[in-house]
Amino acid sequence: WKDPKDGKEPNNWGACFGGSVWEFDEETGMYYLHCFSKKQPDLNWENPVVRDEVFNMMTWWCEKGVDGFRMDVISMISKDPAYPDGEIRDGLHGDMSPYVCNGPHVHEYLQEMNQRVLSKFDLITVGETPGVTTEEAKKYANLDGSELNMVFQFEHMGTTEGKYGKWTTKKPEMKKVRAVMNKWQNDLEGKAWNSLYWDNHDQPRAVSRFGDDSPMYREVSAKMIATCLHMLKGSPYIYQGEEIGMTNAYFKSIDDYKDIEAINAYKEYTESGLMTEEEMLNCLKMVSRDNARTPMQWDDSTNAGFSSAPASDLYIAMDPDKDRPTAKKEMAAPDSLYHEVKKLIRIRQSHKALQSRGKITFVYAEKNAYPLAYIREAGDEKILVIINAAAEAKEAIYNFGAAAEAKNGKITVPAQSAGFYRI
């Protein structure tokens, strides 16, 4: 809670879901802070009574037998006590991130949580950590276990951010994505643990964002993306529908969107004149969170087998693509993405070089970063992974040695595909 400043909000911070982070309360005459929706007030972690309540609640769940916790925006629980104005970057509001991410007491609070709750149970913990750097990640997910087991970082998801933050139609450049991967894999080596993900409930579909979801390339592109994920070092996460290659929904009207972030952003950017309605809709088609929130596609029956209710009763519309992938089709086809993901998991489990202790080294194949290549190794086992996200075939040039079947040290990688080789 904060008092008004000159009769207005305490500062100029903009909320992640649009508008100000401050909501005025008539009863108290004060403002309360909400970094996201006004229905999600930020807890005051500086108050020891609040921390007691949180830890008691967590203990209650642990005693019920939960396996762990995924902690939402946990890097934002400690704020700069001065609450200064932020730089106006989107033309509308001040940027709060320097003052709410990785704040002065965040590690103190997490260590207290660990001592009082987490260390007393057999749990897995992952912290969603907006604004985290590799240096901060070494504290959140350090291998001494004093805070969390691993983090969800967003740097690879932010490679397209520009003038209006996430709202863009640009696709990620592999060169930038590769640089982010290289940094996180190398910087955390032997010091902290990372999660691996492309998809989740807050991100558009991976094959639409990082690959090619056209009918010609959707399946091979999704396999390429899956191979890259499962061959990296860290704990891989698979989001529902990712294993069958679900794509962005590409809704054509703002009325089809349900996410508060998308609706508020559309309203703010179009009413302010920063974007036209068409421009903003194109941004939503590319990066809206609703792309990941359409119903799971089980089969070709009504509502893709998700529900027998009328389509108008669903929370959100189905992907309108009539040729959309379904679990039934994917499970029936032996060479499908679904079976490829299962194979990748088996391969990862059966090769030490691909497991937690396996070292990773990125290889520069070409100046434009196509294809992306890296080596995983443990003991005398070495595995070269090559990822080609380009729309055409590319040659990977590497001194494979006599053990590899490659002519003059070259392997040609087809468009939108991946391969891995013992070397």
Where would I find each of the regions flagged by the language model?
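Active-site and adjacent substrate-binding regions of carbohydrate-active enzymes
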Residues: W1-I423
